[in-house]
């Protein structure tokens, strides 16, 4: 396993313009990112070439975009796929509402085939209907491998799922990861911490990825310290480098 370490651009949401964002990413110690909607307009495919050119000039690799909330309507969702094709992006982390599960997912699969894009469902915690293994297992039984899992370790913990066991269970559909860690206050409110210092067993999780020769986007996410995220993110990067 020889993966490029990326950081979710949402971690730098305070730095909204690309000229502000790029130095922050570099200061954290990486040259790759999963781009969120703060730093690109995925609804406008015509913007993709210029955005991609700015990333190329800054020598920053886009490993994925997301998380994108898809409607299941072919025409409505198509611009996001067109954006990815124009920008040369091959991975998108996604979510969708329950009413999109049947006909909507067929449309999403059709778009993924048409634009040669790998999609990964983002499990967004205990409050999210896609946060538990049972529903994910059902969805994967009804879809092709164009739709896989973009596993968020902290939100798995929030849904009382073991992220190590979840990675093992869905290893053949694991197409991306958000490496993120939580600790909780007495009221069960989560707080982001440096990866491996909270509940996540980071060495065991990385062992699962290495044994499977995981090759998807490897993305750090730390949502704390919005106005000054670099110190914590730098520590996250250092920790992950020791385990990749």
Locate predicted features.
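Acidic/polar N-terminal loop/beta-strand segments that form early-domain functional surfaces
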Residues: 10, 36-38, 67-68
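Active-site acidic/histidine proton-transfer and metal-coordination neighborhood
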Residues: 32, 57-61, 67-149, 156-158
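Positions that flank functional sites
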Residues: 40-41, 70, 99, 126-127, ...
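Glycine-rich, proline-tolerant flexible connector loops at the mouths of alpha/beta enzymes
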Residues: 34-52, 56
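Histidine-acidic metal/acid-base catalytic patches
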Residues: 1-6, 11-31, 83-88, 132-151, ...
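Aromatic/hydrophobic pocket-lining residues that form π-stacking "cages" and hydrophobic walls in ligand
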Residues: 21, 51, 80, 108, ...
């Amino acid at each position: 396993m020889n993966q490029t370490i990326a950081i979710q651009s949402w971690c730098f949401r305070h730095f909204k313009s690309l000229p502000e964002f790029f130095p922050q990413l570099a200061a954290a110690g990486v040259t790759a990112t999963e781009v969120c909607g703060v730093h690109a307009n995925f609804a406008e495919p015509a913007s993709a070439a210029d955005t991609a050119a700015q990333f190329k000039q800054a020598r920053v690799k886009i490993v994925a975009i997301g998380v994108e909330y898809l409607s299941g309507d072919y025409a409505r969702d198509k611009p996001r796929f067109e954006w990815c094709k124009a920008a040369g992006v091959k991975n998108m982390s996604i979510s969708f509402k329950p009413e999109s599960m049947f006909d909507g997912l067929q449309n999403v699969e059709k778009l993924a085939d048409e634009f040669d894009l790998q999609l990964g469902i983002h499990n967004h915690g205990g409050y999210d209907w896609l946060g538990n293994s049972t529903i994910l297992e059902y969805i994967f039984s009804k879809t092709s491998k164009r739709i896989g899992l973009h596993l968020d370790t902290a939100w798995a913990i929030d849904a009382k799922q073991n992220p190590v066991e979840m990675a093992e269970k869905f290893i053949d559909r694991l197409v991306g990861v958000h490496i993120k860690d939580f600790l909780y206050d007495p009221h069960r409110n989560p707080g982001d911490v440096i990866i491996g210092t909270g509940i996540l067993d980071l060495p065991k999780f990385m062992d699962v990825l290495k044994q499977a020769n995981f090759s998807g986007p490897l993305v750090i996410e730390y949502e704390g310290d919005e106005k000054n995220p670099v110190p914590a993110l730098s520590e996250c990067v250092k920790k992950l480098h020791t385990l990749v």
